């Protein structure tokens, strides 16, 4: 329920500039490596796939959210409701952008990386970002209320014990001028850099580089971008 509810309210969050810069950064890496035939894991509504296609790069997307994939398919994008473990094709590059890895519990991360390796050709690349501790504690935590037209959205995010728990409340006006209430929670997990390095190496990748991604301040990175290559 949490992710499906999030898909209904995501467009009202002020993430556009950050996502635009993040997508531009990933596109730059893809052009630099001259990569094609890409699987975008956790593709959401398909914005990054659209950027890839607009630049002549073949792309396929998967997501666990039915609502998100409906939007992808409405745009005639090649995307399916699938878990990574269900994918049988091979690709030259995999991307997981805007917190995808942070939605995976620590005990499942290494298997996720192994599943990613399985769907890549030899020497294929895996590009992903993760939130830094600063990104969770100083940027993501907090409360937000959005009151627009026929909707009221309440967000309350608390970061403790390496978990960001975000409670979402949505009130939607019905035809009878009544309000329908929906509630859900999404949980994200902080993964420290040493844990990620170990998990990536165990999954059969080498790490070419780890980049700082600074959006809110130049002093501390909001996210880290990992550039990994299948051995």
Please report, for each region that a protein language model flagged, where it lies by residue:
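SAM-dependent methyltransferase
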Residues: 130-197
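Conserved class I S-adenosyl-L-methionine
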Residues: 1-33, 35-42
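A short acidic, Gly/Pro-enriched loop at the edge of an enzyme's catalytic core
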Residues: 85-94
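A short glycine-rich, Lys/Arg-flanked "PGG" loop and its adjoining helix->strand segment in the class I
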Residues: 110-122
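Class I SAM-dependent methyltransferase SAM/SAH-binding core
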Residues: 46-85
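Conserved beta-strand signature within the Rossmann-like core of class I S-adenosyl-L-methionine
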Residues: 123-130
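Core SAM-dependent methyltransferase catalytic element
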Residues: 219-231
């Amino acid at each position: 329920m949490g992710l499906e509810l999030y898909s209904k309210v995501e467009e009202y969050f002020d993430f556009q500039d950050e996502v635009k810069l993040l997508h531009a950064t990933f596109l730059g890496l893809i052009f630099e490596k001259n990569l094609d035939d890409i699987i975008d894991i956790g593709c959401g509504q398909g914005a990054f796939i659209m950027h890839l296609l607009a630049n002549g790069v073949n792309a396929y997307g998967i997501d666990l959210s039915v609502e998100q994939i409906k939007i992808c398919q409405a745009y005639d994008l090649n995307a399916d409701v699938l878990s990574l473990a269900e994918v049988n094709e091979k690709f030259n590059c995999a991307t997981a952008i805007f917190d995808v890895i942070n939605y995976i519990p620590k005990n499942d991360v290494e298997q996720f990386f192994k599943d990613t390796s399985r769907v890549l050709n030899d020497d294929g690349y895996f590009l992903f970002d993760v939130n830094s501790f600063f990104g969770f504690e100083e940027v993501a935590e907090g409360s937000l209320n959005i009151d627009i037209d026929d909707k009221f959205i309440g967000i309350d995010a608390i970061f403790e014990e390496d978990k960001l728990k975000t409670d979402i409340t949505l009130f939607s006006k019905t035809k009878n001028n009544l309000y329908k209430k929906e509630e859900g929670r999404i949980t994200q997990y902080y993964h420290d850099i040493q844990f990620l390095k170990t998990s990536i190496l165990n999954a059969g990748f080498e790490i070419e580089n780890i980049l700082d991604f600074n959006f809110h301040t130049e002093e501390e990175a909001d996210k880290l971008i990992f550039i990994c290559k299948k051995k």
